[in-house]
Amino acid sequence: MFHFLYEIERGNKMIKGTELFVKALKAEGVDTLFAYPGGQAVDLFDALYDEHEIEMILPRHEQALIHAADGYARSTGKVGVCLVTSGPGATNLVTGIATANYDSVPLVCFTGQVPLGLMGNDAVQE
């Protein structure tokens, strides 16, 4: 989670990476986010909590999430945007990403990641 805690100075205000993520989503016109929370993405969920311009859809499983985002993109013509945690959260998206890819459906998927120091140590999730 530490990589979302970096702050940059913008004028006299420090801006967290999570705030920049939310600002980037808004700048790209994202108004709906399909998401499933988990430890490695919890900081992003905290930043999105008070954001009322982006509707968050929280299904009960990542596979439902990716297929819902696919259906959303097909029915609205907008990009389906997803946010999940690392490990199984990410791998549960694979079939839905492949389905969307075969039909040229636009999806953007974000996943959490374990801290850099834990990579390569079988730490795929919390």
What are these language model-derived features?
Residues F2-Y6:
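Aromatic (phenylalanine/tyrosine) cluster motif
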Residues I8-E126:
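N-terminal alpha/beta PP-like core and its mobile active-site loop of ThDP/TPP-dependent enzymes
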